[in-house]
UniProtKB/Swiss-Prot annotation:
It catalyses: CMP + ATP = CDP + ADP; dCMP + ATP = dCDP + ADP. PANTHER family: CYTIDYLATE KINASE, CYTIDYLATE KINASE/PANTOATE-BETA-ALANINE LIGASE. ATP binds at G11, P12, T13, A14, S15, G16, K17, G18, T19. This is Cytidylate kinase. The gene is cmk. The lineage of its organism: Bacteria, Pseudomonadati, Pseudomonadota, Betaproteobacteria, Burkholderiales.
Length: 222
């Protein structure tokens, strides 16, 4: 049977998992899945359609019909590039609120699993190792202090020309952490066999090197 390796990288908002996942995928030549972008796309599409966050059926319908295309550092929704639009803090907060609904998560499950193709996949999100790819040979739970994450998110937004307030970001991250960890549908938590990686005082390259070292030790097709 053909082995399609998956490196699952989970963690809270602004923990650095997206950047680490991107660099790991480049290093090993695997495809990349940014699962958080899918929830942000549902958030953007539903916001544009004027759908209330409490209308779970309508949100799930949008998720099941998501017309999305990914490219290097770019994403398209129904043919429109929305790479910057989905990174707005308001859309991120809306995505976090949408992600608590099981019907939405169910609608996106098969779409996420369809990204598993040769030569392999690096998947980053919040439930990659616990729900979407529980058989991944390497599961990493990447985290950092909320203060470090707020500073990173602030820099990301400013670098993209998006105005931000670090105190507001800190409050938003704390609220999102509570929501992600306490939701009934796939709460944010490490898989039982996940490697824990605290990046509060690490550079991106150090975190990437650690993930690559772990993968080299467990890679079944090596």
């Amino acid at each position: 049977m053909t082995i399609v390796n998956v490196i699952a990288i989970d963690g809270p908002t602004a923990s650095g998992k997206g950047t680490v996942a991107h660099k790991v995928a480049d290093a090993v030549g695997f495809h990349l899945l940014d699962s958080g972008a899918l929830y942000r796309l549902v958030a953007l599409a539903s916001d544009r359609a004027g759908i209330d966050l409490a209308d779970v059926d309508a949100l799930a319908k949008i998720a099941s019909r998501l017309d999305v295309k990914f490219g290097p550092d770019r994403v398209w929704l129904q043919g429109e590039e929305v790479s910057l639009a989905i990174r707005a803090e308001a859309i991120g907060n809306r995505a976090s609120a949408i992600a608590v609904h099981q019907p939405v998560r169910d609608a996106l499950t098969q779409l996420q699993r369809s990204f598993r193709k040769l030569p392999g996949l690096v998947a980053d999100g919040r439930d990659m190792g616990t729900v979407i790819f529980p058989d991944a040979p390497l599961k990493v739970f990447l985290t950092a202090s909320v203060e470090a994450r707020a500073r990173r998110r602030y820099k990301q937004l400013i670098d993209k020309g998006i105005s931000a307030n670090i105190e507001d970001l800190l409050r938003d991250l704390e609220a999102r952490d509570v929501r992600d960890r306490t939701r009934t549908a796939a709460p944010l938590r490490p898989a039982e066999d996940a490697k824990l990686l605290d990046t509060s005082d690490m550079t991106v390259d150090q975190a990437v090197a650690q993930v690559l070292e772990w993968f080299a030790a467990v890679r079944p097709d090596a």
